[in-house]
């Protein structure tokens, strides 16, 4: 017997531990972040947007939630092999779809809406529940990783460039750089408000890890990163198109490696869409490897 319950803030530690157990089951390494979960829950109506499943002993055996607005909604589903019983993923998916359609119906000013979800390449059960419920495979994403197995030297900065950390006056120029360079197939443009929510984490970021590169005063590169328990995480790395292929991206990435190495972190990771083949080939040349693959699913909402 499975019992579904809505979320409360008191569930956060328990849910995080379950997510980590799912990470370990699939990849042998934790990948879930308390800060990310706190940020996500801050944006949710916990009594309506999320659910946990328990067995008769009271153990947490499943988790699902819905987030988003303005026609763009996302669902997270966590099931654990073999702890989560067969069919639990369908119960959680039913709750998520019902709530996502409610949210879409409330957004009367949007022309269309869709629900996005992700499954790892090794989780057949999640892949099946998405596909059985009318989701299409939209694209694939790679987690790129580098592990620090020895000293990491700081690369010499080219004289042409000046380096600084982010300040509030940089916001519009930084957003324009990101949107002008993130133009690969399948990527939807973001409004500045959506980008701000994605990057600044409700104020939970450290400007030390938001590194900007200028040439003659013009912003030509940026690395927007976070220091997490598992290592450095580069959320966005951008180089102006007329500076690509000239070594700036390589230098900036290696600079971030050295920054996180000096913080005694074990490595650095980032995510990249498989359709952005130029980027992930570049990361591999720098010494990163693909540690995980995710399938992005999408489903139109009524």
Model-derived features with residue positions:
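Conserved hydrophobic beta-strand within the GNAT/NAT acetyltransferase core sheet
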Residues: 75, 115-117, 234, 268-272
